[in-house]
């Protein structure tokens, strides 16, 4: 048995436990007889934590339009804490996926709403649609609305891949064909002659064929070209919808400077209600997803009040001040498919004030291998802890901070939450992150 820190080893089993429980593990080593933990070199006291950052997916009910999301999130987190036996602490982060925020708001629009807005803003004749991402969920349904709002669509696809890395054709094929993607403009016929049919690695879709057929099915004429210079669209159309996400402002500026008559970005389509629809004043169609065959769920709007309300409810019920954020796509890149997982305009559109800024951290490996390479054991631990306690408020340029990921807190935590919650059937649209702001010195 084990009592008051005494470890007893038997010939065939190792018994480890305390006054309340006993765990027996297989053991085939020698009999060490009686041993006390006090005889062992232990570098951490009994009062210190053994766990740092913890990310938990929180199960919630299915969210419908009109639901009190603030109350549902608060209750779900507190019930999970009670059921699973953990406590809410100051500076915990409660993250809510953008999908359930938009669902609770009822922030939707239809394909016909998109068509009406495109026609009103770009004239309804020939429209150049440039640099869309290759996605059935993200863009195809928007393209249906765009095509219904014009007589002809000239679709200009970037190559060899779209903005977030979905590949139309491999770089090896580009090299073998002697094509310069920075300057060469390819017609559909030339593209097929050089590269044939190329299907997406994961979906099996030939997006060139798919997008062309979709445009024609909506009653518009379709012409497809391939180029990476925005100006390449101007011989074909002077009313342009640029569909890139993170480079949209530069693309629009280049087109207007080059003489385009009218240019809209996706954030300017559905940025106001159409026939009573939802909208997003800041991001328009950016961040939208397919809801049904004819409806689009837009990125959430006006959710600053939501994160503040959840923060207040948790404070009122637990006495703890937590941070709260709404998150969408994480900003990570898939090394297999080479896809940058950020089809939303931002990782987090709304968050509480404690999530502003970037981490200010020292690199433990650097300190251990350089400043304190002559130390070990408790002396090393205390020296590193003292460095952390006395670190400058701004470590930019300090060699001891190199490799510590100087990115926005919301991008880092939002990416962690996106990976935790998943995008399928986990049923955890809320994530609780604990210990993110702790360091090696926190007990």
Predicted feature residues:
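Conserved mixed alpha/beta catalytic, RNA-binding, or beta-rich assembly cores of soluble enzyme
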Residues: 45-90, 99-443
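N-terminal amphipathic/hydrophobic targeting modules at extreme N-termini
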Residues: 6, 12-23, 29-35
């Amino acid at each position: 048995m084990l009592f008051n820190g005494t470890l007893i080893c038997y010939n065939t089993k190792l018994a480890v436990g305390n006054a309340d429980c006993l765990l027996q593990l297989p053991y085939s080593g020698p009999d060490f007889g009686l041993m006390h933990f006090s005889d062992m070199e232990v570098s951490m006291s009994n009062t210190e934590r053994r766990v740092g950052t913890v990310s938990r997916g929180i199960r919630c009910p299915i969210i419908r339009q009109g639901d009190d999301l603030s109350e549902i999130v608060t209750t779900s987190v507190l019930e999970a804490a009670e059921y699973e036996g953990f406590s809410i602490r100051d500076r915990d982060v409660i993250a809510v996926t953008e999908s359930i925020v938009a669902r609770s708001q009822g922030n939707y629009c239809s394909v016909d709403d998109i068509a009406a807005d495109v026609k009103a803003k770009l004239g309804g004749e020939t429209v150049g649609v440039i640099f869309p991402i290759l996605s059935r969920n993200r863009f195809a349904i928007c393209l249906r609305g765009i095509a219904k709002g014009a007589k002809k669509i000239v679709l200009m696809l970037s190559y060899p891949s779209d903005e977030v890395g979905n590949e139309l054709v491999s770089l090896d094929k580009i090299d073998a064909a002697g094509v310069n993607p920075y300057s060469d403009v390819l017609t559909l016929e030339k593209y097929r002659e050089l590269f044939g049919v190329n299907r997406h690695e994961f979906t099996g879709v030939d997006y060139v064929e798919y997008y062309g057929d979709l445009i024609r099915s909506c009653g518009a004429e379709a012409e497809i070209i391939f180029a990476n210079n925005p100006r390449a669209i101007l011989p074909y159309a002077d009313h342009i919808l640029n569909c890139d996400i993170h480079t949209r402002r530069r693309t629009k500026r280049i087109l207007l400077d080059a003489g385009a008559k009218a240019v809209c970005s996706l954030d300017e389509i559905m940025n106001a209600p159409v026939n009573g629809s939802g909208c997003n004043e800041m991001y328009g169609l950016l961040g939208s997803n397919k809801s049904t065959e004819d409806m689009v769920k837009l990125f959430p709007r006006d959710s600053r009040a939501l994160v503040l309300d959840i923060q207040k409810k948790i404070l009122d019920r637990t006495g703890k001040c937590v941070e709260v954020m709404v998150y969408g796509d994480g900003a990570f890149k898939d090394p297999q498919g080479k896809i940058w997982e950020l089809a939303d305009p931002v990782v987090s559109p709304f968050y509480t004030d404690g999530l502003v800024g970037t981490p200010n951290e020292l690199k433990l490996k650097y300190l251990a291998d350089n400043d304190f390479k002559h130390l070990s054991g408790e002396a090393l631990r205390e020296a590193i802890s003292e460095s952390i306690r006395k670190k400058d408020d701004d470590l930019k340029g300090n060699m001891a901070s190199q490799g510590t990921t100087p990115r926005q807190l919301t991008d880092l935590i939002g990416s962690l939450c996106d990976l935790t919650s998943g995008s399928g059937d986990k049923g955890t649209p809320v994530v609780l992150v604990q210990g993110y702001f702790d360091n090696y010195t926190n007990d």
